[in-house]
Amino acid sequence: MIDIHSHIVFDVDDGPKSREESKALLAESYRQGVRTIVSTSHRRKGMFETPEEKIAENFLQVREIAKEVADDLVIAYGAEIYYTLDALEKLEKKEIPTLNDSRYALIEFSMHTSYRQIHTGLSNILMLGITPVIAHIERYDALENNEKRVRELIDMGCYTQINSYHVSKPKFFGEKYKFMKKRARYFLERDLVHVVASDMHNLDSRPPYMQQAYDIIAKKYGAKKAKELFVDNPRKIIMDQLI
């Protein structure tokens, strides 16, 4: 499997705090069957403003750590970019990375961003010649149960990603993110998802869940669909090919 959304670099955002935590995440991801991970540390003005130099420096250390986990574990560079005009300017100047230096960039918004703002932001990115991969589409209230809006964004030239955890079945009690799991299922059932990725941050509250999600999708939608969402489409993204 190929995971294009992850927080594996230590001490740069709300992901791992130490080299040891980074290594534990990589090892668990590998155990689940992931062989390529794109590191997408947060870039968000006012919340995650770690200098690019430090992110790059720590990333290179994580790439070395990956060699200790397995010879065939590949770590690529990227970013999860919270959309602002500042981020748009940095993308234009190539000051923040796309996914593995491809045409694709992982873009996020706040849960409560209006559809108009989402549409405008993604249009602005497309005008730079960059193809947005919309991070965890199940989070956005403006897209909830709205096939028309998601199709409109796809028709514009965007791609969509959902988190592996939200593929799993909601628990009966105490499930904080039950509504996101329902949204993810809605999008999957309508064939509105291009990629499933982990968005892993740590082993305690936000582990990978990739193997579990793969198995659920293979069982419910078929092995071909699972391969498309976890292997084929992510590979095309990091190889800078059209999906």
From Swiss-Prot:
Cofactor: Mn(2+)
GO terms, biological process: capsule polysaccharide biosynthetic process
Pathway: Capsule biogenesis; capsule polysaccharide biosynthesis
Impact after mutating residue 199 to N: Loss of activity
Reaction equations catalysed: O-phospho-L-tyrosyl-[protein] + H2O = L-tyrosyl-[protein] + phosphate
Cross-referenced PANTHER family: TYROSINE-PROTEIN PHOSPHATASE YWQE (PTHR39181:SF1)
Family: Belongs to the metallo-dependent hydrolases superfamily. CpsB/CapC family.
Role summary: Dephosphorylates CpsD. Involved in the regulation of capsular polysaccharide biosynthesis.
Name recorded for this polypeptide: Tyrosine-protein phosphatase CpsB
Species of origin: Streptococcus pneumoniae
